[in-house]
A protein has these predicted regions:
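N-terminal edge beta-strand
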Residues: 23-51
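Short edge beta-strand segments in beta-sheet-rich domains
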Residues: 26, 62, 128-132
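Short aromatic-acidic-glycine turn motif
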Residues: 71-82
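C-terminal segment of classical bacterial N-terminal signal peptides
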Residues: 13-20
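Extracellular/periplasmic metallocenter environments
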Residues: 37, 88-139
Length: 139
């Protein structure tokens, strides 16, 4: 497990789109977090479309986004100081209380991908307390 805050590989790409996506609109999804919920917690996106998810932590504790979709997408970038990198893949996105993190990616695999917060508070998993959801990728 390796932590990286400002590595070039995970710096938010802004409005730049990867090759092959020129002229396509980036779909922006705002997800707010607090104890112990993602809202909305069900999201649908299209395979091949660039997606920007803005996580706004309105809670009183730190939260994070963990999902297998991070391994089922291309050109994954994050604007956050807390990013866990596993090999050459982003493993999770962390966002402190009162902060916003932006995740950009291009989902490539159709399916439903669960997501959750893996933080704990007083020994209790945020995921077990209900902080989870799903992203469905359709054609």
């Amino acid at each position: 497990m390796r932590w990286s805050g400002a590595a070039a590989a995970v710096v938010l790409a802004g409005t730049m789109l990867p090759a092959g996506y020129a002229g396509e609109e980036v779909k922006t999804i705002a997800i707010s977090t607090q104890e112990f919920v993602f809202a909305p917690n069900l999201v649908t996106v299209h395979a091949g479309q660039r997606v920007r998810i803005l996580f706004s932590n309105r809670g009183t504790v730190n939260h994070e986004f963990v999902s297998p979709i991070l391994n089922a997408a291309e050109d994954v970038t994050v604007s956050s100081q807390g990013v866990r990198v596993e090999g050459d893949k982003i493993g999770e996105v962390n966002f402190a209380k009162g902060k916003v993190a932006a995740l950009e990616m291009t989902p490539t695999k159709v399916g439903t991908f669960q997501f959750w917060c893996a933080e704990t508070t007083a020994g209790r998993s945020h995921r077990d307390l209900g902080m989870r959801g799903a992203i469905t990728v359709v054609k």
